[in-house]
Amino acid sequence: KPKEDKEWVKFKAKHITSQSVADFNCNKTMNDPDFTPDGQCKPVNTFIHSNTGPVKDICRRASGRVNKSSTQQFPLTTCNKPIRCKYSQSNTTNFICITCRDNYPVHFVKIGKC
C-alpha cells in the first residue's frame, strides 16, 4: 500500500470534519492547540463535513498538480475574521474547488466550482 501523501494528511486535518454542521464549533476547533501550533489564530478556514472518501474521490485520475471541482455538493462551515480569536461561523452547501496532486487533495482553493 503506497504511503499517504503528507499534504493529504495535512489537508484532512485542516479541512475535513466528521462532526455535523449542527455540532461544529468554530471557536473550539480553530483554537485547538493542534490547529494553531504557532499560537496564532488563522484568519479563515473552511471545513468540509464529510468522510474522507468522497473528498479524495475528487482527485481520482488526477495526475500531476491540478485544480478540480467536486461533482457533488458538500455541507461546509467557514470560520472567519477572528476578533481576539473569536470566530464568526457561516454554513453553506456547495461544490468545492481543490488542488489535487497525484490523486490526493492537497489544498482547498475555494467554495464553488473552479
UniProtKB/Swiss-Prot annotation:
<keyword id="KW-0964">Secreted</keyword>
<dbReference type="Pfam" id="PF00074">
    <property type="entry name" value="RnaseA"/>
</dbReference>
<dbReference type="InterPro" id="IPR001427">
    <property type="entry name" value="RNaseA"/>
</dbReference>
<comment type="subunit">
    <text>Monomer.</text>
</comment>
<dbReference type="InterPro" id="IPR023411">
    <property type="entry name" value="RNaseA_AS"/>
</dbReference>
<feature type="glycosylation site" description="N-linked (GlcNAc...) asparagine">
    <location>
        <position position="27"/>
    </location>
</feature>
<dbReference type="GO" id="GO:0003676">
    <property type="term" value="F:nucleic acid binding"/>
</dbReference>
<feature type="disulfide bond">
    <location>
        <begin position="26"/>
        <end position="79"/>
    </location>
</feature>
<dbReference type="GO" id="GO:0050830">
    <property type="term" value="P:defense response to Gram-positive bacterium"/>
</dbReference>
<feature type="active site" description="Proton donor">
    <location>
        <position position="107"/>
    </location>
</feature>
<comment type="similarity">
    <text>Belongs to the pancreatic ribonuclease family.</text>
</comment>
<feature type="disulfide bond">
    <location>
        <begin position="59"/>
        <end position="100"/>
    </location>
</feature>
<dbReference type="InterPro" id="IPR023412">
    <property type="entry name" value="RNaseA_domain"/>
</dbReference>
<keyword id="KW-0255">Endonuclease</keyword>
<keyword id="KW-0540">Nuclease</keyword>
<comment type="function">
    <text>Endonuclease, hydrolyzes highly polymerized RNA, poly(U) and poly(C), and the dinucleotides CpA and UpA. Hydrolyzes rCA, rUA and rUG. Has cytotoxic activity against cultured human submaxillary gland carcinoma cells.</text>
</comment>
<keyword id="KW-0378">Hydrolase</keyword>
<feature type="disulfide bond">
    <location>
        <begin position="97"/>
        <end position="114"/>
    </location>
</feature>
<keyword id="KW-0325">Glycoprotein</keyword>
<dbReference type="InterPro" id="IPR036816">
    <property type="entry name" value="RNaseA-like_dom_sf"/>
</dbReference>
<protein>
    <recommendedName>
        <fullName>Amphinase-4</fullName>
        <ecNumber>3.1.27.-</ecNumber>
    </recommendedName>
</protein>
<feature type="disulfide bond">
    <location>
        <begin position="41"/>
        <end position="85"/>
    </location>
</feature>
<feature type="glycosylation site" description="N-linked (GlcNAc...) asparagine">
    <location>
        <position position="91"/>
    </location>
</feature>
<feature type="active site" description="Proton acceptor">
    <location>
        <position position="15"/>
    </location>
</feature>
<feature type="binding site">
    <location>
        <begin position="42"/>
        <end position="46"/>
    </location>
    <ligand>
        <name>substrate</name>
    </ligand>
</feature>
<keyword id="KW-1015">Disulfide bond</keyword>
<dbReference type="GO" id="GO:0004519">
    <property type="term" value="F:endonuclease activity"/>
</dbReference>
<feature type="glycosylation site" description="N-linked (GlcNAc...) asparagine">
    <location>
        <position position="67"/>
    </location>
</feature>
<dbReference type="GO" id="GO:0005576">
    <property type="term" value="C:extracellular region"/>
</dbReference>
<dbReference type="GO" id="GO:0004540">
    <property type="term" value="F:RNA nuclease activity"/>
</dbReference>
